[in-house]
Amino acid sequence: MSIKLPLSNINSGGNSNNSSSSNSTSNNNININIGNGIPTNIEKMTFEDSETQKLNIKQQSNNNTSTSVCVSSIHSSSPISSPTSHQVNKSSGSLPPVIKRSPTTTHHHNSSGSNSSSSSSGSNNNNNQIKTSNGMNKPNPTGFLFGSKPRENSQNKIDDNKGVNLAVSTSNSSNNFHKSHSESNIININAPPVETVNMEEIYNNIPSSISMENIRENENNNNSSNNNSNNNNNNNNNNNNSNNINNVNGNKSSLASSTSSISSLSSVSTLSTSNAATNTNTNANTTSTTKTTSTVRSTSPTQFKPRVEFDENNPNAIILSRQRCKSISSPSDFRLNPPSNVHMPTSSLSTSTSTTNVNGLLLPNGVGGVSMSFTPSGLPMTPPTNSSQVDTLQMSTESITIQPSSLDSSSESVSDGLQSVSGSPVTASPSPTISNNTNATTTNNNNNTNTNNNNNNNNNQHNHHHHQHSHSQQHDVYQIKKENFPSSPTSPTLLPSETHDFSSEYSSNPGGKCAICRKPLWSFPISDKSRRCRDCSLVVHRACVPLATECPSAKKSPSKLSVPNGNQSNSSSSSSSSSSSSSSSNSSSSNTKGHSRTPSSPSVSSIPGFQLTSNASQNLHVNSHTLSLLVNGATIDSNHYKRNKKSLEAGARDFHFIFRGCGIPLDEFPLDSYVCGLYSYFAHGRLYLTESYVCFYDGFVFDRTKERTKIIKVSNIASIEKRSSGLNPSAIKIKTFDDQSFIFTHFMHREVAFDDLEGLLIHQESLHFAHSIVANNFPGMNEAIRGQTKRLLSRARLDGHYQIHSKIRCPMPSKEILLMSAIKNNNLDMVVTLLNYYCQVNSDEINSVDSKGYTPLHNAVFSECSDQIFMHLLNQKEVRVRERNMDGNTPLHYFCQKFKSPECQRIVQAMIEKGANINEQNYNGETPLHKAIFNHSVRLLMVYILLKNNANVNIVNNAGESPLHYAVRLGRLDVAKMLLAAGADPTIISLRDRKTALALAVDYDVCPEISDLLRRLDTITTSLEMYELEKFQASLVVEELQKENVVARLDEKLLDKIGCTDKEERRKFLSLKSNRLLIHHPARTQGAKIILKEMETMDIKNGKLIISETELEYTEKIGSGASGKVFKGIYRGRVVAIKVLKSADDEMTREDFLKEFGVLASLESHTIVGLYGVVLEPKICLVMEYCSNGSIYHSIRKNPPSWERFFSFVQQMLAGINALHQSTPQVLHRDIKTLNFLVNHNNKVKVADFGLSRFNTESNQETLNKTRGTSVYCAPEVFEGKEYNERSDMYSMGIVMWEIVYCVVYGCYMIPYQEYNKMFNAFQVALLVNSSKRVLRPTIPIGVPQVLKDLIYCLWDHDVSSRPTATEAMTALAVCEKEYKQNKAQWELVITKKEPTPLPRVAPLPAFPGYRQFYEQNLDIKPIPEEEQIYQEAMEKQRRNQEASANRNQKNKELLNNNN
């Protein structure tokens, strides 16, 4: 099937069997032969918008006669001979020059037809003829509509009430793509006036360099190959007896420059049709008329855009039309499946799989729609949003050949209408290359053969097109090919939907057209000639309402339109394609016309947010962050067509092309756009909204002195309002701060536009508002509040949710809540103003939360704001004080932990009155009382106000710890006393480490006073339980907290104070006072009874327990000695050390036990190992505090200490000895050595092993005079049998200090005196220690600072009175530590970590009577040189060496100076 309008007469027969065609080159008539060819998919062809010349055709029907149509005269400026007159010959008469079509269409079926057809040959005259031959046997659904609205002064006017029906039918001539029955479409031509085609401009655009001889010469080069394919087609069809014109692509005729615009189609001079039969049936009469009209020559060529569309009434029909620079959307109530393949120019095409509205050739989804835009008179067109691949359109001076063809998958192109991919604008009007088609072959039945031939021919043309591209860019060859379309997979599919709901519409857009008849909706005066569907926004003429198809709106039916892919070879995943040649050739640019500014079109890659990528198939994809418009899917919601607006990507290209160079940054993107007018009664431009600007582009300004653009800063807009009056029923007025007013009229969607504009203003005001708060700009914030208050109170949308806010990309200056920012700035005035503003606009900002769940109250605590800010927040009526953050903490939790002001009690009370739960637990189980323990500034004040408001002190967290555990861990004695006074239970065992508060205090040992306090309270609690006096526990605890030893202070007055009035209870209390030894179980054995009787007379502090063996658990043996064994065990959940002695029946054992127990029971100090109780049966046991790190002896042997550790250990040992010596009565240890100083897990040193310890009393003088202890640690007076006193303990302490110093310096341990070889006999040591001539002591390492050596010398001085006490030694040691800290480097140099050389051997001393005098008189033993003397000699030698070296250097310098 082909459609041609040749310059020469082309006659086509109506019947395929006996029709013939004759071509005469001398004939300049335009003949349109419509005969009984194969059924075609083309139903309507329309050329619109020509300015001066009109091709007016009016067809009058005759069922039995052929029809000729007269065409207007066209004058061409080309060398080709132009026709001078135009006639349409018909046997029965002439036709009027205008064909008018009715908007209503009916359908009927023709079951039969005639096989006869007539052919006519044109004579040699200057008439352009259109001959229509009637063939009834094979009716074709082909209807033609030439022309548009006639001029008012035209003499050929048509009565609007008269019309002609065009009968269009389809026959089942192919099993592949036609229905099983014939159809004919009766189209009543009675539509409003339409615009006509300026045929003169078609001729004027033919380049003068082209002649028919060149065309024929090019044609003959390929004639043979085309004839071969034609012969094959004829053999397959067996019914083609006419020499039809086939598409021939010669060397020059196949040139298709990739830079050419679709406007080159305006140079087409003729249109021909062959093998297309049309039955034109009228309603009643069959008359024929002929008329001739003359035309007026046009002085300026008009640029056109072709459009191809499918008709909604005939699925197999295509509308080919031309319009001036306007994009008309296809009807929104249907979607079409893609027929197979249509190919268009590669230079300015944009391909996609989903399109209905393309500037240029408009094809439905998947049909091969082409988007080709150009800019006549400088009016920028909408860039393509969706399109499909289209091949070249071959154009000729004699004909345009429109044939079905296969889609050439090798042809790939991308076009954006305004710009190429490289960013250069396309040429507005390139000169086409024209070819003369002399042979055309169509196929009727065999679709496969025809498709293959056309594919081969098409590939040759495509290859040659690229070959010729480099030689010339002035020639464009366009070709539209369309093969037989299978009806089943590619026919349009309409899913069920509902009926339209039309309402009257005042059409004010001159570019708007009816979705049914495609005619303009707008006319003067404005009236209600149009109707709009309330559901899908379909706009049609009032007369076209009956033709409207069913409404697919989602409001009535959720059905969606299925768009299957008609071409499986071309994958739908390819969104757009572009060949390298077409991309590179698009760099040529042309000047746009009519702009006051002429900005160059930006490339896609230069627009922020757009990205070009390529895949393996050389296809280019345009990606955008805002919207993916390259739709590959087959199911699309019909609501997509509700609003007739451009896509975001297309709008972005338009926007940047129009307003580039106008001061708008490139990162500005149009959020939305609307068709409207400025101070006008009709819509003539487009309004763009960006985040910072309101931009208007005037499409009807042709004066170069006037600007097309109007730009308003959003920040400069003072107010907006709706206007509805007179001829401006839908207007928006914008007033700026500089007293300018802009009225935008005739919005199609004014409510949406106003809503978006209002949302944009509120967003800008919010930005200014936020910037002022973040910058702590109080005046700026006040100004923003005044404007925003007025806006919010007068806004149209009360819910405050604007759709445009989801499109805005500009973030706020801070992610924080604005009120929080003001609180962080600690600006009282700003916070108060904000609170008043939020109250005025009924905002709940006071309770807003951030990403972590923090409210402004939470934030106020962390910001350390003033008390006034906090009180203003609490005084807000709607403030919620129980809001939790992501950790479950309320503002009260953080307030108790973080707040530092002494006014905290007033604020806590205010929060409690507002409803804060004082016992609220966070996700860790902590209450505000737990948090208050961590407050370092107002801890007691916080705890007091919480306890005053009845806070529960025994609530435990997830680890089972109460607030008392927290106080013990932090060592807060004052808080612990306050909690205990409020009823805190010290016996609560935690879940984490299974410890009570007392056990935790002992382990941590942060504050010894807490341990002592908890021990006393534990004793009181146990005593009251034994005597069944638990109800007085709280009163006695309070008394104990106020003053220690409440049990010892019990008297009648105190009993009255605590409320004890019962005589029996008072007797129990007095008995408790006298028996401070608390016995749980009575003794059974005689030895145990003796011990108990002796223990009752002892002065036992705070009451020690008699423990049953069943309460102990032995876990590990840790040592043994002469007096017994030591085990590690557990008592009441506490790790203890259990010293097991012999049986209580042994008298010596009882005596030693009672003395040691008496000393331990009388001592209460954190420097002494604690005693928990005793076990009397079956063996005597002492239950004492466990020290996990062992003794000092084991500690220094395992890990040699540093100087810091040395001072720490010695200070604690001296403190422990001082505690013994300061006790009443005084306790003398008598066995001081490194083994008897224990170290717990916190490296705290405690004095232990009091088996040899005695009270320094007169009754113990005999015992104290006995030699006891380890010989190397014993003082000389002990060996001589003199009285043992506290300074004897200090001698032993000097030896212990030497042991530790030796480990520090040499990094190893040595027993005292071991440096003297083979002197291990204790008697020999005692002899040398007490010798009057020689005083033997351990050797102090060389280099030890003198201040420390002096202290050691004093401690082991032979003269008892010269030795310091424990207190004096502690003071001297503090001086040594101070000097160490001041000269740390010098002290560190002493540490050598090398063991010294042994000193000379000392001869052994024999044991015989008179040995002392013998050795003193006869033994010639040289005294050992003092280490101090050796050290001084070494230092003196070093000094002399340094002085000699300095003298030598000085002499050398003097000699050098003399020589110079």
UniProtKB/Swiss-Prot annotation:
Placement of ANK repeats on the sequence: 814-843, 852-883, 887-920, 924-955, 959-988
Annotated ATP binding sites: I1118, G1119, S1120, G1121, A1122, S1123, G1124, K1125, V1126, K1139
Biased composition (Basic and acidic residues): 149-162
Family, as annotated: Belongs to the protein kinase superfamily. TKL Ser/Thr protein kinase family.
Record keywords, A-Z: ANK repeat, ATP-binding, Coiled coil, Cytoplasm, Cytoskeleton, Kinase, Membrane, Metal-binding, Nucleotide-binding, Nucleus, Repeat, Serine/threonine-protein kinase, Transferase, Transmembrane, Transmembrane helix, Zinc, Zinc-finger
Residues covered by the GRAM domain: 653-724
Coiled-coil segments on the chain, per record: 1425-1460
Summary of the knockout phenotype: Null cells show weak and late developmental defects.
Record-listed E.C. numbers: 2.7.11.1
SMART domains linked: ANK, C1, GRAM, S_TKc
One GO BP annotation of this record: culmination involved in sorocarp development
Stored InterPro entries: Ankyrin_rpt, Ankyrin_rpt-contain_sf, C1-like_sf, GRAM, Kinase-like_dom_sf, Neurotransmitter_ion_chnl_CS, PE/DAG-bd, PH-like_dom_sf
Protein function: Involved in the development of the fruiting body. Overexpression phenocopies the spnA null phenotype.
One Gene Ontology CC term in the entry: cortical cytoskeleton
Protein name, entry field: Ankyrin repeat-containing protein kinase A
Membrane-spanning intervals of the chain: 1293-1313
